[in-house]
Amino acid sequence: MAATALFRSIRRRDVVSAPLSVYKSLAGNAQPSWGSSYIGQNYASFSRAFGSKPVVNDILGTGLGTNNAIREEREKSKSTEAAIVGAQLTRSFRALDVGTSKRLFSTISGDIKTTQEEPKIKSFRPLSPHLSVYQPQMNSMLSIFNRISGVYLTGVTFAGYLLYLKMGMICLTYPSFYQVLYHTQQQLPVITSVTALAAIYHTIKSTHSLLTH
């Protein structure tokens, strides 16, 4: 087999080199010119195509090699891209897990702190919206008593007007009216003293308010 392959290769070289030797001998005997040199170059390129090394096999081999290299590069790039994406996903998942765990622990600790805190002492609301301290003061108490005394004096005056000036003239024939009047007269010293005290206090407080304000 080796001998037959060697014989075939020698025959191919003889066939290819025969026209080239003939061409060289003819070109040496002939006169050189621009056209003959151009034709000789074309013939040389044509004969080189049928040389000992098969051009088709070289082209096919080169093409297959480049295609394989391109495929390998694409596969490598895809594998690197997949590795990068996987690394980014793992980092994001780790960050998400850490963030959720931190939030969970923070909420638990916040609940524990709120449960362990002592209740704050609630202060009393002010009796007047103009006060800055939430506790009863003398000014507010005096103002409240002044208003109460004014209302009391108004009620006593209106009740006396109705009982002694109007209802007596109308209800002279009703015995129940005289009973109410009799019981009212028994409480009259207490009512009179309270009314006098309220009148004095209201007068003094009103005068003081007018002078100061």
Swiss-Prot record:
Q: In which tissues is it expressed?
A: Expressed in flowers, inflorescences and stems.
Asked if Transit peptide is a keyword of the record, the answer is: yes
Where on this chain does heme bind?
Answer: H130
Listed Pfam families: Sdh_cyt
Specify the domain of life of the species encoding this protein.
Eukaryota
Where does the transit peptide lie?
1-105
* Entry GO terms, CC: mitochondrial inner membrane; respiratory chain complex II (succinate dehydrogenase)
Which BP terms from GO are recorded? tricarboxylic acid cycle
InterPro entries, per database record: SQR/QFR_C/D (IPR034804), Succ_DH_cytb556 (IPR014314), SuccDH_FuR_B_TM-su (IPR000701)
Q: In which pathway does it act?
A: Carbohydrate metabolism; tricarboxylic acid cycle
- Topologically, how does it sit relative to the membrane? Single-pass membrane protein
Matching entries from CDD domains are given as: SQR_TypeC_SdhC
GO MF terms here are:
electron transfer activity; metal ion binding
What cofactor is needed? Answer: heme
Q: Does the keyword Transferase apply?
A: no
The main place the protein resides is mitochondrion
Question: Where does the chain cross the membrane?
Answer: 148-165
Keywords linked to the UniProt accession: Electron transport, Heme, Iron, Membrane, Metal-binding, Mitochondrion, Mitochondrion inner membrane, Transit peptide, Transmembrane, Transmembrane helix, Transport, Tricarboxylic acid cycle
**Where does the record place it?**
Mitochondrion inner membrane
Subunit structure, as described in the record: Component of complex II composed of eight subunits in plants: four classical SDH subunits SDH1, SDH2, SDH3 and SDH4 (a flavoprotein (FP), an iron-sulfur protein (IP), and a cytochrome b composed of a large and a small subunit.), as well as four subunits unknown in mitochondria from bacteria and heterotrophic eukaryotes.
Per the entry, what this protein does is: Membrane-anchoring subunit of succinate dehydrogenase (SDH).
Q: What is this protein called?
A: Succinate dehydrogenase subunit 3-1, mitochondrial
